[in-house]
Amino acid sequence: MMEKFQKLALLIDAENIALDKLESVIQKISAYGRIVIQRAYGDWSKESLKNWKDSLNRFGIKAQQQFNYTPKKNSTDMALTIDALDLLYQSSYDALAIVSSDCDFTPVSIYVREHGIYVIGIGEKKTPEAFKKICNKFILFKDKK
């Protein structure tokens, strides 16, 4: 039986997930309970993220702007991590869903899980095992045929 949560936070690493997966993410996470926080993180001035606007508006997802402070260094992961911790301390959620295929979210996932929060990871096949294993539930995207 799938657990249902009253306050679920959905944090999306938009720089690390394909836009065509967004609707599927919303459907899959909604099955776990009521999503009260929906945020997508990225540098929205990048050409690769220009097409996200309509989908974010359609699903009511807040776009969190994060510029890269140094060339070739992604600051988005740090912004998402800070928000995950900030929301934890505000008691804003009882389950956290992180959408990314990046292992950089392993430490924050460990931390929030140690504080009694149910952690759901959503990513692609390439997601490192460390992140998959720390999640209470990891949802794998299906490859398009």
Question: Over which residues does each language-model region extend?
Answer:
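Short, well-ordered beta-strand core segments
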Residues: 96, 137-139
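Short beta-strand segments
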Residues: 98-100
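Acidic, divalent-metal-coordinating active-site segment for phosphoryl/phosphodiester hydrolysis
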Residues: 103-110
